[in-house]
Protein backbone atom coordinates (compact mmCIF):
# COMPACT_ATOMS: atom_id res chain seq x y z
CA UNK A 1 0.00 0.00 0.00
CA UNK A 2 1.37 3.42 -0.98
CA UNK A 3 -0.02 5.34 1.99
CA UNK A 4 -0.81 4.98 5.67
CA UNK A 5 -4.48 4.99 6.60
CA UNK A 6 -5.65 6.51 9.88
CA UNK A 7 -6.39 9.91 11.35
CA UNK A 8 -3.70 12.50 10.65
CA UNK A 9 -3.03 16.07 11.63
CA UNK A 10 -4.33 18.68 9.19
CA UNK A 11 -1.45 21.05 9.84
CA UNK A 12 1.03 18.71 8.17
CA UNK A 13 -0.72 19.29 4.83
CA UNK A 14 -2.82 22.41 5.10
CA UNK A 15 -0.79 24.83 7.24
CA UNK A 16 1.71 26.48 4.89
CA UNK A 17 3.07 29.70 6.45
CA UNK A 18 5.53 30.28 3.60
CA UNK A 19 2.88 30.17 0.86
CA UNK A 20 2.87 33.19 -1.47
CA UNK A 21 -0.75 33.98 -2.34
CA UNK A 22 -1.62 34.15 -6.05
CA UNK A 23 -3.58 36.94 -7.71
CA UNK A 24 -6.18 34.38 -8.72
CA UNK A 25 -6.70 32.88 -5.24
CA UNK A 26 -9.84 33.57 -3.27
CA UNK A 27 -8.60 34.68 0.16
CA UNK A 28 -10.65 34.32 3.33
CA UNK A 29 -10.15 35.68 6.84
CA UNK A 30 -11.74 33.45 9.49
CA UNK A 31 -12.09 34.29 13.17
CA UNK A 32 -11.33 30.93 14.78
CA UNK A 33 -12.07 29.97 18.39
CA UNK A 34 -10.49 26.50 18.84
CA UNK A 35 -11.69 24.03 21.47
CA UNK A 36 -9.43 23.98 24.56
CA UNK A 37 -6.23 22.06 23.80
CA UNK A 38 -6.42 22.46 20.01
CA UNK A 39 -3.44 24.52 18.77
CA UNK A 40 -4.34 27.44 16.48
CA UNK A 41 -2.26 26.05 13.58
CA UNK A 42 -4.23 22.82 13.68
CA UNK A 43 -7.53 24.71 13.88
CA UNK A 44 -6.61 27.00 10.98
CA UNK A 45 -5.42 24.07 8.89
CA UNK A 46 -8.62 22.17 9.69
CA UNK A 47 -10.68 25.09 8.36
CA UNK A 48 -8.62 25.18 5.16
CA UNK A 49 -8.95 21.43 4.70
CA UNK A 50 -12.64 21.03 5.48
CA UNK A 51 -13.65 23.94 3.26
CA UNK A 52 -11.62 22.65 0.29
CA UNK A 53 -10.27 19.19 -0.56
CA UNK A 54 -9.72 17.58 2.81
CA UNK A 55 -11.27 14.70 4.64
CA UNK A 56 -10.20 13.24 7.95
CA UNK A 57 -8.00 10.51 6.51
CA UNK A 58 -5.98 9.70 3.42
CA UNK A 59 -8.08 8.01 0.73
CA UNK A 60 -6.71 6.05 -2.22
CA UNK A 61 -8.36 8.42 -4.73
CA UNK A 62 -6.05 11.18 -3.42
CA UNK A 63 -3.48 9.59 -5.69
CA UNK A 64 -5.58 10.38 -8.77
CA UNK A 65 -5.42 14.14 -8.30
CA UNK A 66 -2.88 16.82 -7.53
CA UNK A 67 -3.50 17.93 -3.96
CA UNK A 68 -1.02 20.76 -4.29
CA UNK A 69 -3.05 22.26 -7.08
CA UNK A 70 -6.45 22.01 -5.43
CA UNK A 71 -6.03 22.27 -1.67
CA UNK A 72 -6.96 25.28 0.45
CA UNK A 73 -4.03 26.58 2.47
CA UNK A 74 -3.93 28.32 5.83
CA UNK A 75 -1.05 30.71 5.16
CA UNK A 76 -1.12 33.03 8.18
CA UNK A 77 -2.49 33.07 11.73
CA UNK A 78 -2.63 36.01 14.11
CA UNK A 79 -4.15 36.34 17.59
CA UNK A 80 -7.13 38.70 17.96
CA UNK A 81 -6.19 41.64 20.17
CA UNK A 82 -8.21 41.78 23.37
CA UNK A 83 -9.71 38.29 23.03
CA UNK A 84 -8.14 35.20 24.51
CA UNK A 85 -8.04 32.07 22.42
CA UNK A 86 -9.34 33.76 19.27
CA UNK A 87 -7.29 33.87 16.10
CA UNK A 88 -7.64 35.21 12.60
CA UNK A 89 -6.77 32.41 10.19
CA UNK A 90 -6.08 33.44 6.61
CA UNK A 91 -6.93 30.80 4.02
CA UNK A 92 -6.16 30.82 0.29
CA UNK A 93 -8.33 28.81 -2.12
CA UNK A 94 -7.27 28.01 -5.68
CA UNK A 95 -9.75 29.47 -8.17
CA UNK A 96 -10.32 26.08 -9.81
CA UNK A 97 -12.36 24.98 -6.79
CA UNK A 98 -15.23 27.30 -7.75
CA UNK A 99 -17.86 27.39 -10.47
CA UNK A 100 -17.82 30.59 -12.52
CA UNK A 101 -20.58 33.11 -11.84
CA UNK A 102 -22.07 31.19 -8.91
CA UNK A 103 -22.22 32.86 -5.50
CA UNK A 104 -24.12 29.77 -4.38
CA UNK A 105 -21.20 27.48 -5.15
CA UNK A 106 -18.68 29.87 -3.61
CA UNK A 107 -20.57 29.83 -0.30
CA UNK A 108 -21.24 26.11 -0.39
CA UNK A 109 -17.49 25.55 -0.72
CA UNK A 110 -16.17 28.11 1.73
CA UNK A 111 -18.80 28.03 4.50
CA UNK A 112 -20.87 24.97 3.61
CA UNK A 113 -19.50 22.37 5.98
CA UNK A 114 -16.79 23.69 8.20
CA UNK A 115 -18.93 25.63 10.71
CA UNK A 116 -20.07 22.47 12.47
CA UNK A 117 -16.52 21.23 12.92
CA UNK A 118 -15.83 19.61 16.31
CA UNK A 119 -12.31 20.96 16.84
CA UNK A 120 -13.70 24.51 16.74
CA UNK A 121 -15.75 26.13 19.45
CA UNK A 122 -16.82 28.89 17.05
CA UNK A 123 -15.97 30.18 13.59
CA UNK A 124 -16.74 33.42 11.79
CA UNK A 125 -15.98 34.40 8.21
CA UNK A 126 -14.82 38.02 8.54
CA UNK A 127 -13.87 38.90 4.97
CA UNK A 128 -13.24 37.51 1.48
CA UNK A 129 -10.91 38.76 -1.24
CA UNK A 130 -12.54 38.03 -4.59
CA UNK A 131 -9.87 37.91 -7.31
CA UNK A 132 -10.37 39.92 -10.50
CA UNK A 133 -10.47 36.70 -12.54
CA UNK A 134 -13.51 35.52 -10.55
CA UNK A 135 -15.23 38.94 -10.38
CA UNK A 136 -15.20 38.96 -14.17
CA UNK A 137 -17.43 35.87 -14.31
CA UNK A 138 -20.31 37.77 -12.64
CA UNK A 139 -22.77 40.21 -14.17
CA UNK A 140 -23.15 42.01 -10.86
CA UNK A 141 -25.75 44.74 -10.23
CA UNK A 142 -28.29 45.09 -13.06
CA UNK A 143 -27.48 48.79 -13.58
CA UNK A 144 -25.34 50.41 -10.91
CA UNK A 145 -25.25 53.88 -9.43
CA UNK A 146 -24.59 56.04 -12.49
CA UNK A 147 -27.12 54.31 -14.74
CA UNK A 148 -29.73 54.57 -11.98
CA UNK A 149 -29.19 58.32 -11.66
CA UNK A 150 -29.56 58.69 -15.42
CA UNK A 151 -32.76 56.61 -15.47
CA UNK A 152 -34.26 58.64 -12.62
CA UNK A 153 -32.77 62.00 -13.65
CA UNK A 154 -31.74 62.72 -10.05
CA UNK A 155 -28.27 64.06 -9.32
CA UNK A 156 -26.19 65.60 -6.55
CA UNK A 157 -28.14 64.34 -3.56
CA UNK A 158 -29.10 61.15 -1.73
CA UNK A 159 -32.41 59.58 -2.77
CA UNK A 160 -35.36 59.47 -0.37
CA UNK A 161 -37.51 56.44 0.37
CA UNK A 162 -40.13 55.22 2.79
CA UNK A 163 -41.49 51.82 3.78
CA UNK A 164 -45.29 51.70 3.72
CA UNK A 165 -46.75 50.91 7.15
CA UNK A 166 -48.66 49.19 8.67
CA UNK A 167 -46.77 46.55 6.80
CA UNK A 168 -49.48 43.91 6.98
CA UNK A 169 -53.25 44.30 6.77
CA UNK A 170 -53.88 47.15 4.31
CA UNK A 171 -56.00 46.42 1.24
CA UNK A 172 -54.32 46.99 -2.13
CA UNK A 173 -56.35 50.13 -2.82
CA UNK A 174 -55.50 51.74 0.53
CA UNK A 175 -51.88 50.65 0.14
CA UNK A 176 -51.70 52.36 -3.26
CA UNK A 177 -53.20 55.48 -1.71
CA UNK A 178 -50.47 55.55 0.95
CA UNK A 179 -47.83 55.16 -1.79
CA UNK A 180 -49.33 58.03 -3.78
CA UNK A 181 -49.39 60.39 -0.79
CA UNK A 182 -45.70 59.78 -0.03
CA UNK A 183 -44.55 60.18 -3.64
CA UNK A 184 -46.69 63.26 -4.19
CA UNK A 185 -45.13 64.87 -1.11
CA UNK A 186 -41.61 64.63 -2.50
CA UNK A 187 -40.12 61.18 -1.89
CA UNK A 188 -38.34 59.43 -4.76
CA UNK A 189 -39.32 55.92 -3.71
CA UNK A 190 -41.70 54.01 -1.53
CA UNK A 191 -41.12 50.42 -0.50
CA UNK A 192 -42.97 47.19 0.06
CA UNK A 193 -42.08 45.77 3.44
CA UNK A 194 -39.88 42.69 3.15
CA UNK A 195 -42.67 40.39 4.36
CA UNK A 196 -45.29 41.74 1.97
CA UNK A 197 -45.40 39.04 -0.71
CA UNK A 198 -48.87 37.83 -1.67
CA UNK A 199 -51.05 37.28 1.37
CA UNK A 200 -54.83 36.76 1.61
CA UNK A 201 -55.53 40.40 2.55
CA UNK A 202 -53.58 41.72 -0.46
CA UNK A 203 -52.61 39.62 -3.46
CA UNK A 204 -49.51 40.68 -5.33
CA UNK A 205 -51.18 41.48 -8.65
CA UNK A 206 -53.66 43.89 -7.04
CA UNK A 207 -50.88 45.61 -5.15
CA UNK A 208 -48.72 45.96 -8.27
CA UNK A 209 -51.64 47.50 -10.16
CA UNK A 210 -52.59 50.07 -7.52
CA UNK A 211 -48.95 51.00 -6.85
CA UNK A 212 -48.34 51.53 -10.57
CA UNK A 213 -51.36 53.85 -10.63
CA UNK A 214 -49.92 55.76 -7.66
CA UNK A 215 -46.56 56.09 -9.42
CA UNK A 216 -48.03 57.46 -12.66
CA UNK A 217 -50.38 59.85 -10.86
CA UNK A 218 -47.63 61.29 -8.64
CA UNK A 219 -45.22 61.56 -11.59
CA UNK A 220 -47.79 63.56 -13.54
CA UNK A 221 -48.30 65.91 -10.60
CA UNK A 222 -44.69 66.49 -9.58
CA UNK A 223 -42.85 66.23 -12.89
CA UNK A 224 -40.31 63.93 -11.21
CA UNK A 225 -39.66 60.25 -11.86
CA UNK A 226 -41.03 58.11 -9.03
CA UNK A 227 -40.70 54.47 -8.05
CA UNK A 228 -42.10 51.89 -5.66
CA UNK A 229 -40.07 48.80 -4.75
CA UNK A 230 -42.50 46.06 -5.76
CA UNK A 231 -41.48 42.99 -3.79
CA UNK A 232 -41.19 40.10 -6.25
CA UNK A 233 -40.00 37.61 -3.62
CA UNK A 234 -42.07 34.42 -3.86
CA UNK A 235 -42.17 30.76 -2.89
CA UNK A 236 -40.73 29.54 -6.19
CA UNK A 237 -38.33 31.07 -8.71
CA UNK A 238 -40.96 30.75 -11.43
CA UNK A 239 -43.48 32.75 -9.40
CA UNK A 240 -40.81 35.37 -8.63
CA UNK A 241 -40.04 35.79 -12.33
CA UNK A 242 -43.78 36.02 -13.11
CA UNK A 243 -44.04 38.97 -10.73
CA UNK A 244 -40.98 40.66 -12.22
CA UNK A 245 -42.42 40.23 -15.72
CA UNK A 246 -45.70 41.82 -14.64
CA UNK A 247 -43.81 44.76 -13.12
CA UNK A 248 -42.02 45.25 -16.43
CA UNK A 249 -45.33 45.13 -18.30
CA UNK A 250 -46.69 47.86 -16.03
CA UNK A 251 -43.67 49.97 -16.97
CA UNK A 252 -42.54 50.64 -13.40
CA UNK A 253 -38.85 51.39 -12.78
CA UNK A 254 -37.91 49.08 -9.92
CA UNK A 255 -38.62 45.74 -8.21
CA UNK A 256 -37.40 44.30 -4.94
CA UNK A 257 -36.09 41.00 -3.61
CA UNK A 258 -35.20 39.50 -0.21
CA UNK A 259 -31.88 38.01 -1.21
CA UNK A 260 -31.05 35.90 1.83
CA UNK A 261 -34.46 34.29 2.36
CA UNK A 262 -34.97 34.00 -1.41
CA UNK A 263 -31.47 32.60 -1.91
CA UNK A 264 -28.55 33.57 -4.13
CA UNK A 265 -29.61 31.39 -7.04
CA UNK A 266 -33.01 33.08 -7.28
CA UNK A 267 -31.43 36.49 -6.73
CA UNK A 268 -28.90 36.07 -9.54
CA UNK A 269 -31.64 34.94 -11.95
CA UNK A 270 -33.69 38.00 -11.06
CA UNK A 271 -30.69 40.32 -11.44
CA UNK A 272 -30.05 38.98 -14.95
CA UNK A 273 -33.70 39.50 -15.87
CA UNK A 274 -33.60 43.05 -14.47
CA UNK A 275 -30.61 44.02 -16.58
CA UNK A 276 -32.12 42.53 -19.72
CA UNK A 277 -35.39 44.39 -19.15
CA UNK A 278 -34.34 47.73 -17.72
CA UNK A 279 -35.65 47.18 -14.19
CA UNK A 280 -33.74 48.45 -11.17
CA UNK A 281 -33.40 45.93 -8.33
CA UNK A 282 -33.76 46.85 -4.66
CA UNK A 283 -32.39 44.27 -2.22
CA UNK A 284 -33.57 43.74 1.34
CA UNK A 285 -31.38 41.76 3.75
CA UNK A 286 -34.09 40.03 5.83
CA UNK A 287 -32.48 37.21 7.88
CA UNK A 288 -29.01 38.79 7.88
CA UNK A 289 -28.81 39.06 11.68
CA UNK A 290 -29.31 35.31 12.02
CA UNK A 291 -26.02 34.96 10.14
CA UNK A 292 -24.02 38.05 11.11
CA UNK A 293 -25.02 39.12 14.62
CA UNK A 294 -22.73 36.94 16.76
CA UNK A 295 -19.25 38.40 17.10
CA UNK A 296 -17.48 35.04 17.17
CA UNK A 297 -19.61 32.83 14.91
CA UNK A 298 -21.30 33.17 11.54
CA UNK A 299 -20.50 35.44 8.60
CA UNK A 300 -19.84 39.18 8.84
CA UNK A 301 -22.26 41.35 6.86
CA UNK A 302 -19.43 42.76 4.75
CA UNK A 303 -19.09 39.30 3.18
CA UNK A 304 -22.84 39.11 2.52
CA UNK A 305 -22.63 42.59 0.98
CA UNK A 306 -19.77 41.57 -1.32
CA UNK A 307 -21.72 38.48 -2.31
CA UNK A 308 -24.74 40.62 -3.16
CA UNK A 309 -22.65 42.88 -5.39
CA UNK A 310 -21.54 39.78 -7.28
CA UNK A 311 -25.01 38.23 -7.43
CA UNK A 312 -26.64 41.52 -8.36
CA UNK A 313 -28.69 44.33 -6.83
CA UNK A 314 -28.83 48.11 -7.26
CA UNK A 315 -29.74 48.99 -3.65
CA UNK A 316 -29.04 47.11 -0.44
CA UNK A 317 -29.92 47.86 3.18
CA UNK A 318 -26.76 48.55 5.15
CA UNK A 319 -27.74 49.90 8.57
CA UNK A 320 -27.92 53.55 9.58
CA UNK A 321 -24.79 54.32 11.68
CA UNK A 322 -26.73 57.11 13.40
CA UNK A 323 -27.06 56.68 17.13
CA UNK A 324 -25.02 53.48 17.17
CA UNK A 325 -21.62 53.09 18.81
CA UNK A 326 -18.66 54.93 17.30
CA UNK A 327 -16.78 51.75 16.42
CA UNK A 328 -19.74 50.55 14.38
CA UNK A 329 -19.56 53.69 12.26
CA UNK A 330 -16.15 52.89 10.77
CA UNK A 331 -17.07 49.26 10.18
CA UNK A 332 -20.34 50.21 8.47
CA UNK A 333 -18.63 52.80 6.29
CA UNK A 334 -16.08 50.12 5.41
CA UNK A 335 -18.66 47.87 3.79
CA UNK A 336 -20.57 50.85 2.36
CA UNK A 337 -17.38 51.64 0.42
CA UNK A 338 -17.09 47.98 -0.59
CA UNK A 339 -20.55 48.32 -2.12
CA UNK A 340 -19.97 51.59 -3.97
CA UNK A 341 -16.33 51.92 -4.94
CA UNK A 342 -14.27 50.29 -7.69
CA UNK A 343 -11.19 49.75 -5.57
CA UNK A 344 -10.97 49.50 -1.78
CA UNK A 345 -7.69 49.46 0.14
CA UNK A 346 -7.11 47.06 3.01
CA UNK A 347 -7.87 48.89 6.25
CA UNK A 348 -8.16 46.85 9.42
CA UNK A 349 -9.54 49.78 11.44
CA UNK A 350 -12.61 49.65 9.17
CA UNK A 351 -12.77 45.86 9.21
CA UNK A 352 -11.43 45.51 5.68
CA UNK A 353 -8.98 42.60 5.75
CA UNK A 354 -8.04 42.60 2.06
CA UNK A 355 -7.61 45.06 -0.75
CA UNK A 356 -10.54 44.45 -3.10
CA UNK A 357 -10.50 45.35 -6.80
CA UNK A 358 -13.97 45.19 -8.37
CA UNK A 359 -12.60 46.21 -11.79
CA UNK A 360 -15.66 47.52 -13.65
CA UNK A 361 -18.42 45.75 -11.71
CA UNK A 362 -21.20 48.33 -11.15
CA UNK A 363 -21.69 49.71 -7.65
CA UNK A 364 -24.62 49.29 -5.26
CA UNK A 365 -26.40 52.13 -3.44
CA UNK A 366 -26.41 51.60 0.34
CA UNK A 367 -29.83 52.09 1.93
CA UNK A 368 -30.01 53.61 5.42
CA UNK A 369 -33.26 52.49 6.95
CA UNK A 370 -34.74 51.91 10.37
CA UNK A 371 -35.51 54.30 13.20
CA UNK A 372 -34.35 57.51 11.50
CA UNK A 373 -36.20 60.84 11.36
CA UNK A 374 -35.60 64.41 10.15
CA UNK A 375 -33.22 65.36 12.99
CA UNK A 376 -30.84 62.66 11.71
CA UNK A 377 -30.78 64.15 8.20
CA UNK A 378 -27.61 66.28 8.57
CA UNK A 379 -25.65 63.36 10.03
CA UNK A 380 -26.92 60.95 7.37
CA UNK A 381 -26.10 63.38 4.55
CA UNK A 382 -22.59 63.78 5.90
CA UNK A 383 -21.92 60.12 6.66
CA UNK A 384 -23.36 58.51 3.52
CA UNK A 385 -22.78 61.28 0.97
CA UNK A 386 -24.75 61.58 -2.25
CA UNK A 387 -24.69 57.95 -3.33
CA UNK A 388 -27.21 56.50 -0.91
CA UNK A 389 -30.91 56.02 -0.28
CA UNK A 390 -32.28 57.35 3.01
CA UNK A 391 -35.46 55.61 4.11
CA UNK A 392 -37.80 57.09 6.68
CA UNK A 393 -40.70 54.75 7.44
CA UNK A 394 -42.29 55.95 10.65
CA UNK A 395 -40.35 59.19 10.07
CA UNK A 396 -42.66 59.91 7.12
CA UNK A 397 -45.91 58.14 7.98
CA UNK A 398 -45.74 59.22 11.61
CA UNK A 399 -46.15 62.89 10.70
CA UNK A 400 -49.05 64.46 12.66
CA UNK A 401 -50.62 65.80 9.44
CA UNK A 402 -50.31 62.63 7.34
CA UNK A 403 -48.09 60.98 4.73
CA UNK A 404 -47.72 63.75 2.16
CA UNK A 405 -46.70 66.43 4.70
CA UNK A 406 -44.34 63.84 6.23
CA UNK A 407 -42.75 63.37 2.82
CA UNK A 408 -42.53 67.15 2.35
CA UNK A 409 -40.76 67.47 5.71
CA UNK A 410 -38.16 64.88 4.75
CA UNK A 411 -37.55 66.37 1.32
CA UNK A 412 -37.20 69.91 2.69
CA UNK A 413 -34.78 68.68 5.37
CA UNK A 414 -32.71 66.83 2.76
CA UNK A 415 -32.56 69.77 0.33
CA UNK A 416 -31.60 72.08 3.21
CA UNK A 417 -28.76 69.78 4.27
CA UNK A 418 -27.46 69.35 0.72
CA UNK A 419 -27.56 73.09 0.13
CA UNK A 420 -25.79 73.80 3.43
CA UNK A 421 -23.12 71.23 2.61
CA UNK A 422 -22.59 72.70 -0.85
CA UNK A 423 -22.14 76.12 0.75
CA UNK A 424 -19.35 74.63 2.84
CA UNK A 425 -21.13 74.50 6.20
CA UNK A 426 -20.27 71.83 8.75
CA UNK A 427 -23.23 69.47 8.95
CA UNK A 428 -21.96 67.67 12.04
CA UNK A 429 -21.72 70.88 14.09
CA UNK A 430 -24.50 73.01 12.61
CA UNK A 431 -26.97 70.23 11.77
CA UNK A 432 -29.70 71.16 14.24
CA UNK A 433 -29.46 74.82 13.31
CA UNK A 434 -29.78 74.02 9.59
CA UNK A 435 -32.96 72.03 10.24
CA UNK A 436 -34.39 74.78 12.47
CA UNK A 437 -33.73 77.41 9.79
CA UNK A 438 -35.52 75.27 7.21
CA UNK A 439 -38.50 74.95 9.59
CA UNK A 440 -39.22 78.66 9.08
CA UNK A 441 -39.97 78.05 5.41
CA UNK A 442 -41.79 74.75 5.83
CA UNK A 443 -44.68 74.33 8.25
CA UNK A 444 -44.61 70.59 7.46
CA UNK A 445 -41.01 70.32 8.64
CA UNK A 446 -41.75 72.45 11.70
CA UNK A 447 -44.58 70.09 12.64
CA UNK A 448 -42.31 67.08 12.16
CA UNK A 449 -39.66 68.61 14.41
CA UNK A 450 -41.93 69.17 17.39
Swiss-Prot record:
Binds 1 Mg(2+) ion per subunit. Mg(2+) binds at residues 191, 193-194. Keywords: Calvin cycle, Carbon dioxide fixation, Chloroplast, Disulfide bond, Lyase, Magnesium, Metal-binding, Methylation, Monooxygenase, Oxidoreductase, Photorespiration, Photosynthesis, Plastid. The disulfide bond which can form in the large chain dimeric partners within the hexadecamer appears to be associated with oxidative stress and protein turnover. The modification N6-carboxylysine is found at residue 191. Its main location: plastid. It comes from the Eukaryota. The record marks 324 as: Transition state stabilizer. One of its GO terms (molecular function) is monooxygenase activity. Substrate binds at residues 113, 163, 167, 285, 317, 369. The modification N6,N6,N6-trimethyllysine is found at residue 4. Pfam families: RuBisCO_large, RuBisCO_large_N. Its EC number is 4.1.1.39. GO terms for cellular component: chloroplast. Its cofactor is Mg(2+). It catalyses: 2 (2R)-3-phosphoglycerate + 2 H(+) = D-ribulose 1,5-bisphosphate + CO2 + H2O; D-ribulose 1,5-bisphosphate + O2 = 2-phosphoglycolate + (2R)-3-phosphoglycerate + 2 H(+). Heterohexadecamer of 8 large chains and 8 small chains; disulfide-linked. The disulfide link is formed within the large subunit homodimers. PANTHER family: RIBULOSE BISPHOSPHATE CARBOXYLASE, RIBULOSE BISPHOSPHATE CARBOXYLASE LARGE CHAIN. HAMAP family: RuBisCO_L_type1. RuBisCO catalyzes two reactions: the carboxylation of D-ribulose 1,5-bisphosphate, the primary event in carbon dioxide fixation, as well as the oxidative fragmentation of the pentose substrate in the photorespiration process. Both reactions occur simultaneously and in competition at the same active site. This is Ribulose bisphosphate carboxylase large chain. The gene is rbcL.
Amino acid sequence: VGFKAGVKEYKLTYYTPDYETKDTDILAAFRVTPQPGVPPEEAGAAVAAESSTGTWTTVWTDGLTSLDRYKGRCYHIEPVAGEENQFIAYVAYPLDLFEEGSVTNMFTSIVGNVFGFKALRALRLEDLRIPVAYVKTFQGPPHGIQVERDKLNKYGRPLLGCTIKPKLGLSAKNYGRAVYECLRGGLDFTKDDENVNSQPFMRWRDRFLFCAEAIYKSQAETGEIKGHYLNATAGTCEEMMKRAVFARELGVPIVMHDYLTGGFTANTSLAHYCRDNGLLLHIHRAMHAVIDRQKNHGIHFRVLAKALRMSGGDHIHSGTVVGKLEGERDITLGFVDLLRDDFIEKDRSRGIYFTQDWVSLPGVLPVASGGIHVWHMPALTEIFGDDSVLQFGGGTLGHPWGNAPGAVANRVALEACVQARNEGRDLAREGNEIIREACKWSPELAAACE
